[in-house]
């Protein structure tokens, strides 16, 4: 489990948030069904360091300290939302979510596509409709990713939400018929198939005419 150290902060509006950012700190908040919002701040350098190793499904051990470096509390949280500056793309705010043990939570799990589809080798295109899969699960059963093998998919084949293999206790929140990935048929392939069908059908018509003339 990834550990992250944060400090308590007193919210004082946008000016204070800007001052924090100038000092290399990022304002954040911790909340949950049984947790009142806790304003905290975190060093940007520390956040950037761990940001590339965590996702929305990564449990984080959050160590909350006061200004005197005393540990106030420790919580197991998940990264709920990251806000970035529109121009610089620097992180400007973070939301941490603390679930309630024993109560199910909703979370988006990354979809991992593995294998090279048969249909792609025939000229088709792999289309992924959902990069993440919304699920409902217990906090201690959150999967890091949902893997789907597309090796056997041919032209026109589709994997629906109902086809996903999920761990025990994890429920997909997509409709059963929702398409997750598919192999699109390129127009060139469709046109060639139609031309072949027409060429095959033509001799049959000629043969029938010859039979009628013989009669």
Curated annotation (Swiss-Prot):
Mind telling me which InterPro entries this protein's record contains?
Rbsml_bL25/Gln-tRNA_synth_N, Ribosomal_bL25/Gln-tRNA_synth, Ribosomal_bL25_b-dom, Ribosomal_bL25_C, Ribosomal_bL25_long, Ribosomal_L25_dom, Ribosomal_uL5_bac-type
Residue ranges with Acidic residues bias: 192-202
Ranges of Basic and acidic residues composition bias in the record? 204-215
For this UniProt record, give its keywords in alphabetical order, as a comma-separated list. Answer: Ribonucleoprotein, Ribosomal protein, RNA-binding, rRNA-binding
Task: Please explain the role this protein plays, according to its UniProt record.
Answer: This is one of the proteins that binds to the 5S RNA in the ribosome where it forms part of the central protuberance.
What are the boundaries of the region Disordered? Answer: 192-215
Q: Record keywords: Phosphoprotein included?
A: no
Record protein name field:
Large ribosomal subunit protein bL25
What assembly does the database describe for this protein? Part of the 50S ribosomal subunit; part of the 5S rRNA/L5/L18/L25 subcomplex. Contacts the 5S rRNA. Binds to the 5S rRNA independently of L5 and L18.
GO MF terms listed in the record are: 5S rRNA binding; structural constituent of ribosome
Q: Give the organism, scientific name.
A: Thermotoga neapolitana (strain ATCC 49049 / DSM 4359 / NBRC 107923 / NS-E)
Pfam families registered for this protein in UniProt: Ribosomal_L25p, Ribosomal_TL5_C
Q: Which domain of life is it from?
A: Bacteria
Which family, according to UniProt?
Answer: Belongs to the bacterial ribosomal protein bL25 family. CTC subfamily.
Per the record, its GO cellular-component terms are: cytosolic large ribosomal subunit
What GO terms describe the biological role, i.e. biological process, of this protein? Answer: translation
């Amino acid at each position: 489990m990834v550990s992250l150290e944060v400090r308590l902060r007193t919210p004082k509006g946008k000016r204070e948030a800007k001052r924090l950012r100038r000092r290399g700190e990022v304002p954040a908040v911790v909340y949950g069904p049984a947790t009142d919002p806790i304003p905290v701040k975190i060093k940007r350098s520390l956040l950037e360091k761990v940001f590339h190793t965590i996702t929305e499904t990564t449990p984080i051990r959050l160590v909350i300290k006061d200004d005197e470096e005393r540990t106030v509390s420790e919580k197991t949280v998940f990264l709920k939302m990251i806000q970035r500056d529109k121009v610089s793309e620097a992180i400007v705010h973070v939301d941490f979510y603390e679930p309630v043990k024993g109560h199910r939570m909703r979370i988006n799990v990354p979809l991992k596509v593995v294998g090279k589809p048969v249909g792609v080798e025939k000229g088709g295109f792999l289309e992924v409709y959902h990069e993440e899969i919304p699920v409902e699960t217990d906090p201690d059963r959150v999967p890091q990713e949902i893997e789907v093998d597309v090796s056997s998919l041919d032209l026109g084949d589709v994997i629906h939400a109902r086809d996903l293999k999920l761990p025990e206790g994890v429920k997909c929140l997509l409709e059963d018929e929702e398409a997750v990935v598919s192999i699109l048929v390129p127009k060139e392939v469709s046109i060639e198939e139609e031309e072949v069908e027409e060429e095959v059908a033509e001799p049959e018509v000629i043969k029938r005419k010859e039979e009628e003339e013989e009669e």
